[in-house]
Amino acid sequence: MLAANQSAISQTCISDDDLTKLPGKFTDHKWTPAGGHTSSYSAVEQTLALKNLSSIETNFVKYFWGDGTNGKASFGFSEGNYFNNLFLGQYSFTVGFYELICKDGNIKTAHEFGTDFKITINPFIEPGLNINGRGRQYDFSVPGNRKNFSNTINLFRYMIFSNKEEPEKINSGNSYIESKPIYHDAYDKHPDVVRNWYFAPAGKMILIEVTRKEYLESLLEFYEREKPGLLKEMDRLIAIDKSTLKLYEKEKDGKSKKDYDYFLNRIKEYETDRQRYENAYKTKKDKVTSLLKSNAESWLNEPAVLSKEVIMGSYCRSGSLKEYEETGCFSFNDFVSIENGYTVYKWNPDLFKQQPATSPAFIKVSLRYKSGIELSEKIRDYYTKNLDFTFIKSILNKK
């Protein structure tokens, strides 16, 4: 049972079972200020966002249901994200369903909730197999069109989905995507599960396939940025150890020779690594350049599909440990068939064209519920059946 706060509804009860059929109460967003990164947006941007959120809330009230709960609404802002080169703000309308509980014969409202309904404008999608910078993203950032908010090179904007059905569901908006159970600890018998629906303006797709040509060109861009970063780091380490050697050279005591030799050998290792990075850069670049030059345009325009080994491996997306040891991150051999691999996706440029930062480009509707808890699952079933998808789509089509 969730812990209760001090606010009580002026009714009495005997047990929690008495409360499940009490009509749900809805509290609009005015009970709490909009949370999150409101300061990241201008007054004009906030006005547009709040207008959209208020419209969503007005519509939601018409079909609100939450027997046995107090549904409290709130508005929230996130920092936002880049969709290709376009920055869009992310903001949301959330209703948390606070369970009514019986405590000392009085009906009270729990101060925590495990079930919520959420509509997010311009959500960022986490597909689970995203290409990433392996902790060196700072080497691969590029200026963005949002002040103090950098973007990344093309390679790290691409998306790969562990569930091959997800891109179609995201683009179609016809069915939900349900997450795997999310356990909070080893004793959690009622894990969180989330259902997500995605919506775009009529006739628009959110995701499109990356072509082989685009993917190969993005690898070349990565190589050109990776090389100077690696060489700079080796030069830094070599310079540090050379400075240390100079200190030992001033010492006349033979006891220092062992330490001197240690740093001397380490410099040689760094110099060897430096040359290896130079060679790896040339090997990787030559391979990709050859594929771009030797294949017909029709081949290059096919979707980029990467092997399971490349995707599931932990060697900076290289196909094998041996390959990784020889030439490093994002060593590339060839594409594979759709049956044997994973398609690479990107944000649809036709959807993410220049527009105001808080303009609604697409929307995600989420239902988070507690598996195995009857009250939570009733809320899940009600909103799954009664969501006003027509209204949600109208927000996008009015732009």
Region spans (language model):
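Bacterial Sec-dependent N-terminal signal peptides
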Residues: M1-T12
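Compositionally biased, low-hydrophobicity segments enriched in charged and small polar residues
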Residues: I9, Q355, F362-I363
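Surface-exposed amphipathic alpha-helical segments
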Residues: Q11, V365-K399
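Short N-terminal segments immediately surrounding and downstream of signal-peptide cleavage
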Residues: Q11-A34, T390-I395
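Acidic/histidine-rich, surface-exposed loop or edge segments in extracytoplasmic proteins
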Residues: G24-S39, S359-I373
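Short, solvent-exposed recognition patches
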Residues: G36-Q354
